[in-house]
Swiss-Prot record:
It comes from Arabidopsis thaliana (Mouse-ear cress). Intracellular vesicle trafficking and protein transport. A lipid is attached at C226, C227 (S-geranylgeranyl cysteine). It is a lipid-anchor. One of its GO terms (cellular component) is plasma membrane. This is Ras-related protein RABA6b. The gene is RABA6B. GO terms for biological process: protein transport.
């Protein structure tokens, strides 16, 4: 169950990005996840936008900083700074427009060119509420995800279907990857319970902090910060 928390202190920051063609629903997915809002008159993103949401992992509060960028070619100059430091990505297409699915290969190639090999990627087929206009079958999305080693699900920002699941599965997997890396690094360094790469591994504790993850406090913002337990 999610609950609102406007002033809760946060322990760590995870940056994630939304990627895909213009008008696939990136902004509405972000507003649905961060503020539980949906706008039928949503306008294309100009440049870059971002929002926060707090997620509880073990005994830590993680602030998920989700970045949304315009899908238009004229904004591609911001590419490198947009991807820098991203630990996760939602790769989004519109199930009613096949061209947006075909372009996933381009977006994935760009992501892999600018991000770490450990970046967690979730393939998202959005607008599942428009099944009568579907041009991309769900099985096609699953097949592509399996071939590329991605997670997959279909969402509807309008009906709030699988939106939580898409973001939280990404954040949860980021936590798993970082925890495994910390444990492995500590074993290689012979420091089972000592500090390594900016993290401490206490017995029985879940670890989320390495050099890519930054300790932070909530910023003063009008956006809702929700904790998921």
């Amino acid at each position: 169950m999610a609950e609102e928390s406007y002033d809760e202190e946060c322990d760590y920051l995870f940056k994630a990005v939304l990627i895909g063609d213009s008008a696939v629903g990136k902004s509405n997915l972000l507003s649905r996840f961060s503020r539980d809002e949906f706008r039928l008159d949503s306008k294309p993103t100009i440049g870059v936008d971002f929002a926060y949401r707090n997620v509880r992992v073990g005994d830590k509060t993680i602030k998920a900083q989700i970045w949304d960028t315009a899908g238009q070619e004229r904004f591609r100059a911001i590419t490198s700074s947009y991807y820098r430091g991203a630990l996760g990505a939602l790769l989004i297409y519109d199930i009613t427009r096949r061209i947006t699915f075909k372009n996933i290969e381009k977006w994935l190639s760009e992501l892999r060119g600018f991000s770490s090999p450990e970046t967690v990627v979730v393939l998202v087929g959005n607008k599942s509420d428009l099944g009568q206009s579907r041009e991309v079958e769900e099985e096609e999305g699953k097949t592509l995800a399996e071939s590329e080693g991605l997670y997959f699900l279909e969402t509807s920002a309008l009906e709030n279907q699988n939106v939580e699941e898409a973001f939280l599965s990404m954040i949860g997997r980021i936590h798993e990857v970082l925890t495994q890396k910390i444990v492995l690094d500590n074993r290689l360094n012979g420091d089972g319970n000592n500090e390594s790469n900016g993290a401490v591994v206490p017995p029985g504790k879940e670890i989320v902090n390495i050099h890519e993850v930054t300790a932070t406090r909530p910023l003063s913002t009008s956006l809702s910060n929700c904790c998921y337990k």
